[in-house]
C-alpha cells in the first residue's frame, strides 16, 4: 500500500452496485452501467444565437459538463442546430416539445441525441415509427422525457394526477412503441418537482426495465432550494445504484448546475474528488473568522487540478487533529496559525498570513504531486479543504 502526502491511500467506501442497464453512446460519451455517471446541463441562451450558445457551451465544458441540451422551439432554432452540434466540444442533445418536425431537423443536423416529450408532442404515438427509423439511420439514441407538468392526458385521466405510477407507465408505454419498431437505444427520465414522488417513480422504473435512466428533479427552484432538492433525490437513488446521467435543474446560471452535479457525485464517491471544503458552522470557541478564512482559501485554490486535502481549522478542539490528517492544514488560535504539511508543523504564522501561506504551500504540494504522477500520488483521490 502506498502513502500519499497525507492520509494512507485506502479504497473509497462503495455504495450499492450500479443497476445493470443496456449501454448507449451519446456521441463519445457512454451512458449506462458500464460507464461513469455523466453530468448534463441545458443552455439558457436562445439557440438561434449560435455564438452565445457556443460560448455558454464552452463555459459548461470548462466547468466539467459532459453533455449539453439545447431548446428548439422555433424553426430558426432548428436551423442553428447543425452549426452548434458541429462546433460544440461536448455532445449536444436537442430538446423537442410540441412540434415533431423538429425531431427530424435535429437528427438531420447531427445532434448527438434527441429528447422527446411524449406528453406534448402532437400525435406523437403515430410518429414513433418515423422517429425510430430516422434515429436508427443516424445512429443516435432517444431520451423519452416524461415530466409531471406535461404528463400525457391519458395517464393524467387514469391516475388523476402525476403519480409515480403515471409517470412510469407513460414512459414505458412510449418505450414499447419504439421497441415495436426495432429501436432500443433509449434512455428514460420521469421527472417531478417533488423529490419524494420523483424518487418513488425512478425506483419503480428501475425495477421494470433496463434502460439507462437520466435523473432530474424538474423545476427544482432557485439555487439553494434546487440544490437541496436535487441532492436529496439524487443521493437517495444513486446510493442504491440507480441513475446513469444527471441534470441538476436550478433557476441559476447553468454552470452552477454542473458544479452542484459534480459535487453530488464526488460526495458519493461516484467521481474522483476535486477541491472540497468542509467547514464547521463556527461557535464561541472559534478564534478566527472561520467564514472569511474558508472563503478566501477556497477562492485562492479555485481551479487547482490536483486531489489535495487541505484543512483550515478555527479552534483548538478539533483543529490540530484535523490538520494532521490532511496533506496541508492550519490550526488557528491566539492570533496565529500552525501550518501542517504531511502531519508535521512546518511553521507558525500570524493570522494575517494564514491564507497567503496556505495557498503558497498548496501550489508547492500540487507541483510535487504532478511530478510524482498526478492525482494518483495523493491519498484521498481529491482536493479537500476542511474548515472548522
UniProtKB/Swiss-Prot annotation:
Residues 369-388 are annotated as: Disordered. Keywords: 4Fe-4S, Iron, Iron-sulfur, Isoprene biosynthesis, Metal-binding, Oxidoreductase. GO terms for biological process: isopentenyl diphosphate biosynthetic process, methylerythritol 4-phosphate pathway; terpenoid biosynthetic process. It is an enzyme of class 1 (oxidoreductase). Pathway: Isoprenoid biosynthesis; isopentenyl diphosphate biosynthesis via DXP pathway; isopentenyl diphosphate from 1-deoxy-D-xylulose 5-phosphate: step 5/6. Converts 2C-methyl-D-erythritol 2,4-cyclodiphosphate (ME-2,4cPP) into 1-hydroxy-2-methyl-2-(E)-butenyl 4-diphosphate. Belongs to the IspG family. This is 4-hydroxy-3-methylbut-2-en-1-yl diphosphate synthase (flavodoxin). The lineage of its organism: Bacteria, Bacillati, Actinomycetota, Actinomycetes, Mycobacteriales.
Amino acid at each position: 500500500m502506498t502513502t500519499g502526502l497525507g492520509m494512507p491511500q485506502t479504497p473509497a467506501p462503495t455504495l450499492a452496485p450500479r443497476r445493470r442497464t443496456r449501454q448507449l453512446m451519446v456521441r463519445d460519451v457512454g451512458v449506462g452501467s458500464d460507464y461513469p455517471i455523466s453530468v448534463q446541463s441545458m443552455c439558457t441562451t436562445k439557440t438561434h444565437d449560435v455564438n452565445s450558445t457556443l460560448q455558454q457551451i464552452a463555459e459548461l465544458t470548462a466547468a466539467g459538463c459532459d453533455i449539453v441540451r439545447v431548446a428548439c422551439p422555433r424553426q430558426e432554432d432548428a436551423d442553428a442546430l447543425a452549426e452548434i452540434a458541429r462546433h460544440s466540444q461536448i455532445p449536444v442533445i436537442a430538446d423537442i416539445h410540441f412540434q415533431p418536425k423538429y425531431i427530424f431537423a435535429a437528427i438531420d443536423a447531427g445532434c448527438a441525441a434527441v429528447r422527446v416529450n411524449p406528453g406534448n408532442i402532437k400525435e406523437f404515438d403515430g410518429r414513433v415509427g418515423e422517429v425510430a427509423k430516422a434515429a436508427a439511420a443516424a445512429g443516435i439514441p432517444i431520451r423519452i422525457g416524461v415530466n409531471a407538468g406535461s404528463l400525457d392526458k391519458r395517464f393524467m385521466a387514469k391516475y388523476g394526477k402525476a403519480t409515480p405510477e403515471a409517470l412510469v407507465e407513460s414512459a414505458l408505454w412510449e418505450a414499447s412503441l419504439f421497441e415495436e419498431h426495432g429501436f432500443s437505444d433509449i434512455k428514460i427520465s420521469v421527472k417531478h418537482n417533488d423529490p419524494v414522488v420523483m424518487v418513488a417513480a425512478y425506483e419503480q422504473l428501475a425495477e421494470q426495465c433496463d434502460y439507462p435512466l437520466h435523473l432530474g428533479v424538474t423545476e427544482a427552484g432557485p439555487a439553494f432550494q434546487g440544490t437541496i432538492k436535487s441532492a436529496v433525490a439524487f443521493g437517495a437513488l444513486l446510493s442504491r445504484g440507480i441513475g446513469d446521467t444527471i441534470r441538476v435543474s436550478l433557476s441559476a446560471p447553468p454552470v452552477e448546475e454542473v458544479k452542484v452535479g459534480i459535487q453530488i457525485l464526488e460526495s458519493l464517491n461516484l467521481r474522483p474528488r476535486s477541491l472540497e471544503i468542509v467547514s464547521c458552522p463556527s461557535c464561541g470557541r472559534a478564534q478566527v473568522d472561520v467564514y472569511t478564512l474558508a472563503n478566501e482559501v477556497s477562492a485562492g485554490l479555485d481551479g487547482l487540478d490536483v486531489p489535495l486535502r487541505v484543512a483550515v481549522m478555527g479552534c483548538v478542539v478539533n483543529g490540530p487533529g484535523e490538520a494532521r490528517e490532511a496533506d496541508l492544514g492550519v490550526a488557528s488560535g491566539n492570533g496565529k496559525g500552525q501550518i501542517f504539511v504531511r502531519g508535521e508543523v512546518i511553521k507558525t504564522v500570524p493570522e494575517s498570513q494564514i491564507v497567503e501561506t496556505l495557498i503558497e504551500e498548496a501550489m508547492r504540494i500540487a507541483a510535487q504531486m504532478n511530478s510524482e504522477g498526478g492525482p494518483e500520488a495523493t491519498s484521498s483521490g481529491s482536493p479537500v479543504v476542511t474548515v472548522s
